[in-house]
Regions:
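Membrane-helix interface/capping segments
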Residues: 66-89
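Alpha-helical transmembrane segments and their immediate juxtamembrane interface regions
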Residues: 125-162
């Protein structure tokens, strides 16, 4: 995924927008389902065994997506070079974080789907844990500077509103 931006401020704004969009895409259905359940809406499972299978399958998919997203994010830095230009570094950073947040976003949507068909609080707990893990890695200028090991000149160029080459 290639991001179009002129300067560090615009990059950070677009990066933040994507992060918040991923969170909002799961918060909206979660809120609607929660409100519907408060009014008495309930999907019942045909048997208790189906519930256990649901926990296992959806829980396994969520765990896989969570760990795969984090693993891909961390292993992606093997290709990183400090010799790249600032624009190349920022593009690399966005691409690796894009994949991570996309995977975590899909995992949150699966947790919301699990909450739709289940009456226990297991999937709510999983959903909250996923949101918490996403908020730990939320966008921050210092995080970008630290992870990309930017030089003082690059930090200055990133923070100023002038165009990045």
């Amino acid at each position: 995924m290639k991001l179009q931006y002129k300067n560090g401020e615009e990059f950070f704004l677009k990066y933040n927008q994507f992060f918040h969009l991923v969170i909002a895409l799961s918060l909206l259905p979660f809120g609607l389902i929660w409100l519907a359940k408060k009014k008495g809406f309930e999907l019942t499972l045909p048997s208790e065994t189906v519930g256990y299978v649901l926990y296992a399958v959806l829980g396994g998919i969520i765990l896989f997506l969570f760990f795969q997203s984090i693993r891909n994010y961390k292993t992606g830095y093997k290709d990183f070079s400090k010799e790249w230009t600032l624009r190349e570094k920022l593009d690399f950073f966005y691409s690796s974080n894009y994949k991570k947040y996309l995977g975590l976003g899909v995992a949150t949507l699966i947790a919301v789907a699990g909450y739709l068909v289940d009456t226990s609080y297991f999937f709510i707990f999983v959903y909250v844990l996923l949101l918490f893990s996403m908020s730990i890695g939320r966008p921050a200028e210092r995080k970008i500077e630290k992870e990309l090991a930017l030089s003082k000149e690059e930090i200055e160029e990133f923070r100023k509103a002038k165009e990045i080459q």
